[in-house]
Each structure stands twice: as C-alpha cells, then as structure tokens.
Amino acid sequence: MEYKLLIGLEVHVQLGLKTKAFCGCKNDFGGIPNSRVCPICLGLPGALPSVNKELVSSAILAGHATNSTIRNIVKFDRKHYAYPDLPKGYQISQNDEPICENGFIFIKTSLGVKRINIARIHMEEDSGKSLHLLSNDNQSYIDFNRAGAPLLEIVSQPDIRSGEEAVAYLNALREIFRYLDLSECSMENGSFRCDVNINLLINENDVNYKTPISEIKNLNSFKSVKLAIDYEESKQKEEWILYRKTLESVGKCTMGFDDKKGITVLQRSKETISDYRYIKDPDLPLIKLESDYIENIKSHRMVELPFDARIRLQEQYGLSDFDVVTLTSDKNLVKYFEEAALTSSEPKKVANWILSEVLSVLNEREIGILDFNLPASYIGELVEFILNGKISGKISKEIFLEMVDRNVSSITIINEKKLEQISDKSFIESIVIEVLNENPKSIELYKKGKSHAVKFMMGQIMRKTSGKVNPVLSNEILMNKLQDV
C-alpha cells in the first residue's frame, strides 16, 4: 500500500503584551483566579471592546517573519460556540479575512531543508480556564483571568509528512516568536499550544483516497506531538485495511491524546464552519492599515531570524551544524559569541569555548546569557592567550572560573598569579637537557619502545618549572633530543 501522511498544524501563540486583546486588563500568567477581569472580558451586557493596537502590530510582525501577504483591511468576526469558559458565548476571531495569508518558513530535518507553507495567521482572544477538582462534590470552577488574552493562530498547509518534520516546524515557529520577543512560547504555561490535523493520502491502482482527518487537540509537548502522529499513522493504516473509510464518507473528528497509554481517543465529531455561525463583529469597526505602517513595523522591529542566522554563521565563521543550532537557540547567545569573536583570530575556538565552558556555568547557575556578567571580549581574549601559548589549556579553565567569580579579565589573573606560560625555546631546551642527564634509565626505556618513559620525563620537566612551560613545545623539544641521544 502506497501512502503519504498529510499533516497540518494549528498553533496558538499567546502574545506577551501588557494588556488583553480587547480590553485594558493586565495580560499575565497565573495569579489569584478571576483577579484580572472586567465587564468586557467577562462578556457583561453593554460592555464594548476596543482593539489592542499591539495585537495588530504583533500580527503584522509575525506576517513579515513568515513571508506572508498582509492585508490592508482588518476585520474581526464572532465565532459562536457554547462552553462554560467562554463568557460571551462567542469568541472574537477572524474568519474569512485573516490578517496574514500565504506565508512559508523553512525547516531542517535529517532529510535536509524543506519549505512548509502557512495558510494563514489570524488574531483572536483566548477563553477562560476550567478547573476540575478531584473532590466528592464533583464540581468544576472557572478562572477568567485568561479570557480575552491576545492570541495569534498560525495554520499550516498539510505539507508536513512525519512526526520529525512536525517537531522541526514547531521548533522553528517557537524560535521565530521568541526572537521577535512576541511570546515566551512556553507549552508549560499554555502560551504555545498545538493541534494536529492528520490523515493519509493512499494510492491504489493509480486512484487516490484520503482517510478521515483526525484533529488531535491540546498536545502539551513536542514529544506528545510526535507520539500522537506516529500512533495515528499506524491506526489509520489499519482502519483503512479493515474498513476503507474515506474523508468524504466520514469527514473529520476531534481526538484527545492519552499520554500514559500513548493512544488517541475520540472526543466528538468535528464541527463545520457553519456550526460556528460566524458573523462580522458589529462592535469592532474595520481597521485600515497603510502600507507605510506595515513596512515601518518591519524596518523597526524585524531581526535576523534563526534559519538565516545559521546560514550566515556557517558561511562567516565556518561553524558546524551543531555549533550554529546551539548558538541560535537564543539570539542573545549569538550576539555574545560575535562580540567575543571580534577579539580572537579563531572564531570557531571561541564558539567551542562558549558552548562548553560558558554554557556549563549558565546551566549550573540556572541563568541565561543576559544574566552572565562577564564581558564577551574577555572570552575572546582568553581564547587568544591559549592559541598564542601564553597559557595552557588546562590552566585556562581555572582562570575562566576565577574570571566568572570575580568578573575580571584573564590578563588580570595571569599577572596577579604569574601564570603566563613559558615558551622560550632556549630555556625549555636547557630544562630538557637537565632532565635527560638526570634520567638515563628513562632514555633506555624509551629506546626499547616504552612510551611511559616519555610521560615520566615530561612530568619531570613540568615539575622543574612548576607547570609553567608550554607542554606542546616542551614535548616537541624532548622528542627531538631523544632522537639525538
């Protein structure tokens, strides 16, 4: 049986704006239940919404970042459905005229680079949150703090073909929104949520069939996304063989995902567009966006995005795939690296140092690069001292830790503790000759092929110089002298 997966993702990003989408209530996570509400987000009679300008500008910025076409006229619609945490009985959203359309981003997987097309990005408000308590009275409570929070929904075309591609796409989107400072994109606190639409396109005897679409709701981790896709792929193949149900005959249904069992569970048959009874919101007028305003947002707020940054870093500095992926996980880490690289002749060595020693300190202290007080130029300077033989690689790590603790440069510590490595050839040669004269037995062992003899003599050289001679140069001179005896 020949088939391919058709996967489209609907991603909800809660924007990190100061206030909610259509009222002045503070937009924040958590807090005392129902402490950040007003007549507008509670849907009380006579309360009139007004559009948060930052919601519109954030949507425009997201459109630029995803290569989308941005509309000049903004229209809001009412999406009607009944649910306890939706106080108005409808959600303010956008139906047939989303602010952004026909965009795309690139992802990279084990199969290479791929373009994923984005059907639309639209603005809407979030619902409240239902809290189901495990108690004898079997009651549920509703917190409306989240009601009216500003959301962008990004809907991809069904261009994704595997769980790996789905996770890569989600990662790419999350990186974009974080780079633009639009959202924390935390799945833990609900500011980055994902629904998966999945079915199979099956070819039998040159005839194509589509299996029913499963929309898997509220997946709470990238791991769950991949597991749900893998399970649905297997399930839909099996159901096709047994029942041969098609999209035309069955349609679309809504599924949940059981993390513990690793299976999808039917929740309900999917509503159609007509079930939501979309109408234009009469309380919100059309908004005209001038082309200059749209372009101004791009020129003032757009930054280099992760995919482009990775290409540039590889071309400019010769970094590996691993290096650039790790560095671009945080735009501030990229900035730190490039500032450090300015003071060194070997940018790749600087990258290695940051990705090992600096990140180790950040992880140990549970801080980000913005909270790391050591100037980037100090790292480049330290790496340069290692490269030119001023200090050894071993002592450099001790120096670095003291630099971090004291927030001083490496040269300060080197001068204070007289740690500069000795690279004077004539001096090292005199020490080597001295060690050879004192250890004739070690010379005999070396001639018999005993490699430990060299290690012993190197140890004697380091002991006589308190470990301050250049070990590479010392070893080179020692080996040359051993050839002559």
Curated annotation (Swiss-Prot):
Q: Which cysteines are joined by disulfide bonds?
A: none
- The protein here is known as Aspartyl/glutamyl-tRNA(Asn/Gln) amidotransferase subunit B
Q: Which reaction is recorded as catalysed by this protein?
A: L-glutamyl-tRNA(Gln) + L-glutamine + ATP + H2O = L-glutaminyl-tRNA(Gln) + L-glutamate + ADP + phosphate + H(+); L-aspartyl-tRNA(Asn) + L-glutamine + ATP + H2O = L-asparaginyl-tRNA(Asn) + L-glutamate + ADP + phosphate + 2 H(+)
Q: Which organism is it from?
A: Borrelia duttonii (strain Ly)
Q: Does the keyword Ligase apply?
A: yes
The entry's keywords = ATP-binding, Ligase, Nucleotide-binding, Protein biosynthesis
State a single Pfam family of this protein: GatB_N
Q: State which Enzyme Commission number(s) the record gives.
A: 6.3.5.-
